[in-house]
Amino acid sequence: MATSQQFLNPTLFKSLASSNKNSCTLCPSPFLQLKSASTIFNYKPLTSSSATIITRVAASSSDSGESITRETFHGLCFVLKDNIDTDQIIPAEYGTLIPSIPEDREKLGSFALNGLPKFYNERFVVPGEMKSKYSVIIGGDNFGCGSSREHAPVCLGAAGAKAVVAESYARIFFRNCVATGEIFPLESEVRICDECKTGDVVTIEHKEDGSSLLINHTTRKEYKLKPLGDAGPVIDAGGIFAYARKAGMIPSA
């Protein structure tokens, strides 16, 4: 190795050899100093022993730490079947819209569920309108399948929907719902999409034990929904970043 260094730069090699001839001590560089591995970070867990949780409004507008019960959703439902993919929820051509820009977010809402097959006679958002009259979406199996697209839950929330109740979800769509905090992805214990019709009046009640109940006032039937678990408080806070700020995991903006 020394021979190759001397061959490449003999002058530099002689200079280094002379200066280090009588010393083999290396001078530590201040840039190589590492922080102690014993540092302990006091992060707060995602779960809470409290029966009440922070609502999205409280999380976004107040730092007082006030906790109130999760709101109840009431309105008309829009019924879909199995395998509703993200291209049907929001076609890829609208992927250039930026949700953080108010005008773009409004446009995303107007295009929500614009890619549905033609056999769905009703439109989720009437052409020319920016909001939907349906506040609850009821789906079948594998809702939100296809490509990973944060615009999918964002457009539903921007259109005015509060919750999706489906038999099951594609994992990536469920996680995007939690991460963005745009809409509640609730899971039914039975196949509700076969028993409800678009336009039925429904209510989703959230109980203190974490479970939820869907009441169809049109058919006078009730359906128990599965608990959201640790994902619930994150959605209530308005998404993963809002929750992390509220919990003290990251600095407030």
Swiss-Prot record:
Annotated Gene3D superfamilies: Aconitase, domain 4
Subcellular location: Plastid, Chloroplast stroma; Plastid
Transit peptide interval: 1-56
Transit peptide in keyword set: yes
Phenotype on disruption: No visible phenotype under normal growth conditions.
Record's GO cellular component terms: chloroplast; chloroplast stroma; plastid
Catalysed reactions, semicolon-separated: (2R,3S)-3-isopropylmalate = (2S)-2-isopropylmalate; a 2-(omega-methylsulfanyl)alkylmalate = a 2-(omega-methylsulfanyl)alkylmaleate + H2O; 2-(3-methylsulfanyl)propylmalate = 2-(2-methylsulfanyl)propylmaleate + H2O; a 3-(omega-methylsulfanyl)alkylmalate = a 2-(omega-methylsulfanyl)alkylmaleate + H2O
EC code(s) of this entry: 4.2.1.33, 4.2.1.170
Protein's pathway: Amino-acid biosynthesis; L-leucine biosynthesis; L-leucine from 3-methyl-2-oxobutanoate: step 2/4
InterPro entries associated with the record: Aconitase/3IPM_dehydase_swvl, AconitaseA/IPMdHydase_ssu_swvl, LeuD
Free-text function comment from the UniProt entry: Catalyzes the isomerization between 2-isopropylmalate and 3-isopropylmalate, via the formation of 2-isopropylmaleate. Functions redundantly with LEUD1 in the methionine chain elongation pathway of aliphatic glucosinolate formation.
Family that this chain belongs to: Belongs to the LeuD family.
Protein name: 3-isopropylmalate dehydratase small subunit 3
Organism: Arabidopsis thaliana (Mouse-ear cress)
